């Protein structure tokens, strides 16, 4: 004969009578770590990424855009600047980005009717330039990150080898090495 014993649950555990409580099993509250918090470790050692070059300045961005423009001209992605275009629409049907080609004279404004400004880049071309610049910047960051990781890994490996050697020397001391031990 099978004998079974059951215990009646108290009201606080009954999910039907206590709608505020979840019918699922309660989880234990996480214990506070006895060791130092991760924030403490972050404060102890300066970040290796603090040494990374700062954000690009406006001059660097302008220089990079000019370099990319020259590359695109070499690849013949840009139309000839002498070809007349309607300033409101490009040949691709996209709006143009207006970039003044030089400084304006003190007596004239940027919207002066003396000179009809033609757009230098289409929206698509600006997108291509920005994409290329972002890719180059990402590649630089990846290279720096890989160098830092490789250095840190080499340091950890050296520390591990030294620790292992010290443990072996402490355990066996000056005993001659044997195949049995």
From Swiss-Prot:
An example molecular function term from Gene Ontology annotations: transcription coregulator activity
Primary localization: nucleus
Region of interest (Disordered), ranges: 18-48
BP terms from Gene Ontology: neurogenesis; positive regulation of innate immune response; positive regulation of transcription by RNA polymerase II; protein transport
InterPro entries in UniProt: Akirin
GO cellular component: chromatin; nucleus
Record keywords, A-Z: Developmental protein, Nucleus, Protein transport, Repressor, Transcription, Transcription regulation, Transport
Family membership noted in the UniProt record: Belongs to the akirin family.
Assembly notes: Homodimer. Interacts with actl6a/baf53a. Interacts with gmnn.
Protein name: Akirin-2
Species name: Xenopus laevis (African clawed frog)
Lineage: Eukaryota, Metazoa, Chordata, Craniata, Vertebrata
